[in-house]
Amino acid sequence: MKSNRFILAALTFFTFIVFLSPFVYSQNVQDLINKGDNYLDVKYDNQKALDTFFEADKISPKNWEVYWRISRAYVYIAERMPGNSDAAKDAQLAVYQKALYYADQAVKLAPTEAVTYLRRAIANGRIALFKGIFSVGDVVNSVKKDCDKAIALGNGGNYVQALAYYLLARTNAEVSKKWKPARSLLGLGWADLDVAITDYKKAIDLYPNFRMFYFDLGYAYMRKDDYTDARDMFNKVIASPKKDENDDSLVISSKAILEKIKDK
């Protein structure tokens, strides 16, 4: 009788553990994701964020939610690496390429999620800027393609969609600096500053009060000699709340630009 009770209790406990384990497993991964996000977005500790996401990867391998975050952390780390020597530049590029690898894996795992294409576009965009956008036309075209795909999917929330429009705008703005006949030979004839301005505005509509969006739109207006709208954007940079690690530097730059163009 006691033996039967023991067996029944053991089976009940085992069943409880079997059903509870996936919940605990899922909660642990989500807790690590939340912790990593906090390191990135609040504490601005990119290395600790990366380490935390790799902890999540050990628990949940091949998880697209983890992979795109690893990519994001690598981009942030690379952005802040010194590039004052050839060896330093090589090391920086290697980190950007790691970011691209994990973003690409995220796309393969979740091809219907806009954020995966956005993170791949961001990693490729950084590589293109690093190498020189007119030396890697195919990479620039892939940035545009991934932004278009993220926008077409339309998911991920306003911030993801705003970033997709912003990156598409910035790509148009940067590429359009080169003489169109010359860049057309590289397959980059599509770039247009007016399109960039339109897409910057879409990004702002989706996610207002973000300093980076206002700053780049202000710069685009300056290229059009529209100093009235440019001043408005730079003043909005100053008035907007801090949401990103680089926001303080944008305020400093905006104040300097406003002083420079005050009589224009």
Positions of predicted regions on the chain:
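Bacterial N-terminal signal peptides
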Residues: A9-S21
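Sec/Tat signal peptide C-region and signal peptidase I cleavage site
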Residues: P22-S26
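Start-of-domain marker
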Residues: N28-K58, E65
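Terminal, low-structured helical/coil segments at or just beyond the last alpha-helical repeat
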Residues: V29-Q30, Y159-A162, A182, K236-K264
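TPR alpha-solenoid repeat register
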Residues: V66, T116, V160-A164, F213, ...
